[in-house]
Amino acid sequence: MKYLAINLGPIIKTFSMARKPKEFWAASYMFSYLMECILAHLQKEKNSLELISPAYEKENKERKGNEENPLVGVGLYPDRAFYAVKQEIDINSLLEDALKSFAKDIVLDVDVARNFFRIMTVCQEYPSSSEAIAGLNKALDVLELNQVAWDSDTFDAILKYLRKANTNLPLYKIAFNKDYYSIGTLEEIARANAKQIDYSYQRYVCIVQADGDCMGKIVSSKQMDGKLNDFSSRLIAFGNDACQRIKAFGGLPIYAGGDDLLFIAPVCGTDGKNILGLIGEIDEKYQKIRDYVDQLKVEDKIDEGGKTKTVPVHTSMSYGISIIYYKYPLYEAWEIARNMLFSNAKQVPGKNAIAINLRKNSGSDFEVVMSKSLQIHYNLDDLIRFTPKESFVSAVAHKIRANEQLLGVLPKEEPFENLDKRLNAFYEKIVDVAAKSADETTYLLKTKDTFEFIYKDYFIEKKRKAEEAKENKKEYREATIEEDMKSIISTFFSVLRIAKFIKGEEVKDE
């Protein structure tokens, strides 16, 4: 049977034009609404096309809202759609009609829309919908690599249109049923409605890019045949729930298409919780998706020692978080968040991870990558809760750094014999736990547990990478002990600094 895939662009190029949250939101919403217009026009051709994904209803309750659940005001449609082709059809003519309708609705010159937006299509034969999704996604990935140059008039017209987000924009009427909708500045989002600035984090915002793990394997699995439309409906409902929670926190949802989330949020929200607490609540909303996938018993085949092995596939959410000063360029912050997600969090074994980059206005840069299923995730929560005054945190970090060589003689292979006892002795003799107050002692013990975990995890991962390289016959340069310790201590210091920052540092001139 023939299958059709549709892909929209240029998303990244459009986002690069945005300077303010309003413009960032508008850039995202345009693509979601364009997809909605395409789905609406193709729905009229049910005899020729059968929609596989995403789910679409003429009166989409998730986007339209009701009295109990007002308009979400965020794009809920992804940039790709998939159809089964039941009989030949002039798809280009239908897409042209959809584009004209889109341009009319958002009050954009149709020639500008035609010249700027890329509506890419691929139509190929496949034996099943699951195989079609896998194959068509690869084909679309290749199509996206083809760059298109725009003339200056088209570029300027889109830029001018996005700037309208600061006054009146037709997209507001579509998204919120209002002629104008107030979207806060980065400074306003950072403050989270606080009347005065008491902590430095109130001058910083979080740009968060999140993505469902193993989703490619899931949607292209045999177990998903005939169920993709229902699954898409569940993902849209999740996106709606996540957006409502982000808004309640004081954040701004930018995009919620399927398992993909993009939003801007304060470090600490209007409800008193911090950004990690918000992520925990989004994960709770995602639990329904996890349960659904587990019920389907999705499987994948992997090669293990030259033999094919069938393993269950589970899903979770991974996050890339860029914490930046409110005057930092928004697009660059988004690039950092994307890099933290796809180059860091998604590379953690088992995924289900958070990767945080804190870029201080002073120029300091701190990064932490952690699995939510491992102890360091809970250690960070504890460190935030028990972090004492600034000078004490710096003193602990200094003690660790000053004794790098001493710590370098600790055991480096499992089962890490006597590591706990030797670290206890180090903290008693060098860090001087006994001389501290009860709160400071609690904090120190938390830092010891954190260091121990980071230390063990580093060498376990180092061994895994070496074995993987050997198995795949690839070159592998083993780091020296000095390099090992510098990396471990750098990660440890970043965890302490990020915990202290989220807990609340004194306001300084920045």
How would you describe each model-predicted region?
Residues M1-E510:
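Regulatory and interdomain segments flanking nucleotide-handling catalytic cores
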